[in-house]
Amino acid sequence: RVKGIAYMEAIIEPPGAPRPAPAPGSTFDIYRSARGEQAVLQENRFVESLISGLDYYLTDADAAEYRRPYLTPGESRRPTLTWPRELPLGGEPRHTYELVRDYSDWLAADTAIPKLFVRAAPGALLARPEALAFVRGFKNQREVTVYGPHFVQEVSPDAIGRALAAWLPTLR
């Protein structure tokens, strides 16, 4: 039985407001094109861009751990190519967009399950005004704000831990 849902930087789709398609030549446009095979499977750009975006927050040991499953070029890196291709952007791929839209609608309608929204500021996925307004409308929810980008858990782990520690005892 689910007693509560805590989330941060979740992939959520407000009604009628899908994330825009990637701009031509952007990182996600490259990942989703034939050029993605070289960029991700051979050059490991997905993992390396994640690490470079967290430069000040990851130790060398942390960065090595992020790289560890993907040290060998080729198919070992396939999950890091599949994921950006499955992320619903511009309503595509349709099956993923519909799945995300369905669970987003469920989260918005549910009143029984307590929710904790750990808002990352400045954040990324939930920084769009329509996305932020949508999740703030979820019922039976508390919100806390912590500093960080999309990978907020690497930037503010202690603040997230404190928020969870304060929220968990409120669950029945």
Feature locations, PLM:
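Short aromatic-enriched loop/helix-cap "lid" or pocket-rim segments at secondary-structure transitions
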Residues: 16-27, 77-81, 128-131, 155-158
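Helix-loop "lid/cap" segments that line or gate small-molecule binding pockets
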Residues: 45-59, 65-72, 85-91
